[in-house]
Each structure stands twice: as C-alpha cells, then as structure tokens.
Curated annotation (Swiss-Prot):
It comes from the Bacteria. HAMAP family: SfsA. This is Sugar fermentation stimulation protein homolog. It holds the Pfam family SfsA_N. Belongs to the SfsA family. The gene is sfsA. GO terms for molecular function: DNA binding. InterPro entries: SfsA (IPR005224), SfsA_C (IPR040452), SfsA_N (IPR041465). It comes from Nitratidesulfovibrio vulgaris (strain DP4) (Desulfovibrio vulgaris).
Length: 242
C-alpha cells in the first residue's frame, strides 16, 4: 500500500460539532465534555458545520497554545457507509503540494528540482516557487476546496478579494514569460469536476476563466481524506458552475 503523503499526528480525536464562534473557534463535545478547537479556515464551510456531525481534531504541536486542538475534518452525510470525511484545514494544500513534489507525484512539475515555500514576488508573497535546469520559474498558489454543488467541486465558498488578487498576480507572471499554477486541493470524494463558484463570487469566477485564457495553469487535485491522514488523488477536469 502506498504511503499517505500527509499522515495526521498521533493523538487525534473525534468529537461532536456544536458551533463555530468568531470564525476561528469551534466547540465540540468529547466524552460528554465541551472542548474548544482552533479553526484556520476563514471560509464559510458551507453545508459542513452541522450541529451533531462528527468532527476530527489534531493536538496542537505547541502544548502551550491557548486552544489545544486544531480542526482537521468534518464528517459529511453521517457516520454510516454513505458518509465521508471533508478536510477543512487550510494549511493542508501548501503542505500537500510540497510533499507531492518531493515524492515525484506532480506530473505538471516534472524536471523541477528546487522547491521553495512562501517566496516573495514584488509586493506579493506566493505559496511556492519551483526552479529547474533550463526551465522557466514556476510559481504556485494553493487553495483548499470543501464545497461541492451538483457534483461540481467549487471554489471559493465565500467572497475572496485575496483570491482575486492572486489570480491577477498569476496572470502577470505568465505575461512575463514564467509559469503560474493554481493548486486546488479538493478535500472530499464526491465532486467529479471542478470550477469557480460564480454564484458565490462572480468576480473570482470571471478572473478564473480570464486566467485560464491567459495561460495560468489550473490543477484541481482530489485530496483523499481518512482518519489516518490525507493523500493525493486524481486531477479533476474543469467545468463552469452554472
């Protein structure tokens, strides 16, 4: 069996989702007690945060952190055989693209031998810069996808000015002769294709297709989420969300 690229740390726990407070705090119950969990997801997590649903949390690496747990995933459609996990930790795509690069599992990055995270370009800081002998610099920006509508995995799940800025930056990169790639990690199993959520953020959706026409590469990969961790799955085809 192939090794999972991003195993969860030891000591993860499941509990019952109660509520979300002030965007970055989530209350869950575990063994009858209330536990507060940190969420780094600023999106709406539309359709996922249902009271009574099972959630997965990992222990904080820093034992002195105010909230001792980090929100990793939500169970969708119950705990039975029809249910599945949806990964909600927005740091996962960045870690996944790096792990997949070093494991040789990014076909669109073949030939590149240097991966540098969080690199500055002008006034922006992008998630990764890849370089290789005789190849144009490849800039990568990562996004987490948790929403599926009518079998289409969609991004974003809330209006994102920052996301629109990133698309403009990527188009500028291509115009200057370098490569630019968006890495969308769809952390759920039920979407069969991927597209921008024009109903939620029409500006982002318009810029997405403008970026495609300009030569920005779109790489929506499936993330295979289980209680053991997250692995990288197949690339999803693009479609328009209508």
């Amino acid at each position: 069996m192939r090794k999972i690229l991003l195993p969860y740390p030891a000591g993860c726990a499941t509990g019952t989702f109660v509520r979300r407070v002030k965007r970055f705090s989530v209350e869950m119950t575990r063994d009858g007690e209330s536990v507060w969990v940190h969420s780094n997801n600023s999106g709406s997590m539309l359709g996922l945060l249902r009271p009574g649903a099972t959630m997965l949390a990992s222990p904080a690496a820093n034992p002195d952190r105010k909230l001792a747990w980090t929100h990793e995933a939500m169970r969708c459609h119950g705990d039975g055989p029809q249910g599945f996990w949806v990964g909600v930790n927005t740091s996962v795509p960045n870690r996944m693209v790096e792990a997949a690069f070093h494991a040789g599992r990014l076909p669109w990055a073949q030939g590149y031998d240097t991966f540098r995270r969080e690199r500055k370009r002008g006034d922006s800081r992008l998630d990764a810069r890849l370089d290789g002998p005789g190849l144009p610099t490849l800039w990568v920006e990562c996004k987490n996808v948790t929403m599926v509508e009518d079998d289409v995995a969609c991004f974003p799940d809330a209006v994102t000015e920052r996301g629109s800025k990133h698309l403009r930056e990527m188009m500028d990169i291509v115009s200057r002769g370098e490569r630019a790639a968006m890495f969308y990690l769809v952390q759920r199993p039920d979407g069969v294709c991927f597209g921008p959520a024009d109903v939620i953020d029409p500006q982002y959706a318009a810029l997405f297709w403008e970026a495609v026409d300009a030569g920005v590469e779109m790489h929506p990969h499936r993330g295979i989420v289980s209680p053991a961790g997250i692995d990288l799955g197949e690339v999803l085809p693009l479609t328009r969300c209508r």
